């Protein structure tokens, strides 16, 4: 799963046992990125 650090804005891939911390700046607030899927909805 891909996350983005809220301080340095870099993309971060988390390991299962690595903990929740940015490896670049050490910040602990990571934002989950939205999926890039496009959804179509029919309207009547």
Swiss-Prot record:
**Could you tell me one molecular function GO term of this UniProt entry?**
zinc ion binding
User: Top enzyme class of this protein?
Assistant: transferase
User: Cofactor comment in the record?
Assistant: Binds 1 zinc ion.
* The UniProt record lists the keyword Translocase: no
Instruction: Name where it's found.
Output: Cytoplasm
- Required co-factor? Zn(2+)
Name the GO cellular-component terms. Answer: cytoplasm; DNA-directed RNA polymerase complex
What does the UniProt keyword field contain?
A: Cytoplasm, DNA-directed RNA polymerase, Metal-binding, Nucleotidyltransferase, Transcription, Transferase, Zinc
Q: How does it assemble?
A: Part of the RNA polymerase complex.
- What exactly does this protein do? DNA-dependent RNA polymerase (RNAP) catalyzes the transcription of DNA into RNA using the four ribonucleoside triphosphates as substrates.
Q: What is this protein called?
A: DNA-directed RNA polymerase subunit Rpo12
């Amino acid at each position: 799963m891909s996350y983005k650090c809220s301080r340095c804005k870099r993309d971060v891939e988390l390991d299962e046992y690595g903990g929740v911390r940015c490896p670049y700046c050490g910040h602990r607030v990571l934002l989950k990125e939205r999926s890039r899927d496009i959804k179509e909805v029919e309207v009547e």
